Amino acid sequence: MSAIHPTAIVEDGAILGENVSVGPFAYIGAKVSIDDGTSVASHAVIEGRTSIGKNNRIFSHSAIGTIPQDLKYAGEDVELIIGDNNNIREFTLLNPGTKGGGSVTKIGNGNLLMGYVHLGHDVILGDNCILANGATLAGHVELGNNVVIGGLTPVHQFVHVGDFAMIGGASALAQDIPPYCLAEGNRATLRGLNLTGLRRHIPREEINALKSAYRELFEEGKALQDVAQRLFEESSSEKVKNLCKFIKTSKRGIPFTRKS
């Protein structure tokens, strides 16, 4: 049974699962679906065609599913899909997709979106990511799994960030960051591998293979695409293959400077 505060507004047509709680002065629109065990705190606004999974915690003053911040938006039927077990902290802004970007924004499972985080239209966010306070993903940005974005870091439209990458706080990211890498600065550039994150999740032999590949790709003065193609074909490491595939398919380029 759901627990809805008497001052909350839940429009006719909204679907709430078992043990959903809705706090004081929250608003749930008519096209919203919220699955079992999710809590919505006071003054949160959830509207539009928004689907929210199980056991999410949505904190006060979040704005979820409000129309995209895109001047081309003309009232099309667009969607926001949120998975399970996410923590969406205070004053977070999550927009649905647009017709020009597939009409859907997708958020995976187990993510922590800290205060004042913004996910723009058509963003694709994987699982188990951490976006620190004030991080901003512009339209069409794609993040893999286990990505960390530091506080107050904006990410440019259409940028892709691979699995287990980390972006330092107060950076400005305008190009693609390959999986397993660390980047920081304004504009952000590669600073090495995200060894802290890798050691928590990836065997040592895979990390050693990534270290060797990183040196050859970014530090030895060789043509990046040529090295990526060769390592993709020759390496027995799946992680190295993933790294090289990302580089080969990057559309915005990889920001790095070679050591002198």
From Swiss-Prot:
InterPro entries xref list: Acetyltransf_C, Acetyltransf_C_sf, Hexapep, Hexapep_transf_CS, Lipid_A_LpxA, Trimer_LpxA-like_sf
Catalysed reaction per UniProt? a (3R)-hydroxyacyl-[ACP] + UDP-N-acetyl-alpha-D-glucosamine = a UDP-3-O-[(3R)-3-hydroxyacyl]-N-acetyl-alpha-D-glucosamine + holo-[ACP]
Q: Which SUPFAM superfamilies match?
A: Trimeric LpxA-like enzymes
Q: Where in the cell is it found?
A: Cytoplasm
| Alphabetized NCBIfam families for the sequence | lipid_A_lpxA, PRK05289.1
Q: What does this protein do?
A: Involved in the biosynthesis of lipid A, a phosphorylated glycolipid that anchors the lipopolysaccharide to the outer membrane of the cell.
- Recorded protein name is Acyl-[acyl-carrier-protein]--UDP-N-acetylglucosamine O-acyltransferase
Q: Give the source species.
A: Sulfurovum sp. (strain NBC37-1)
Task: State the gene name recorded for this protein.
Answer: lpxA
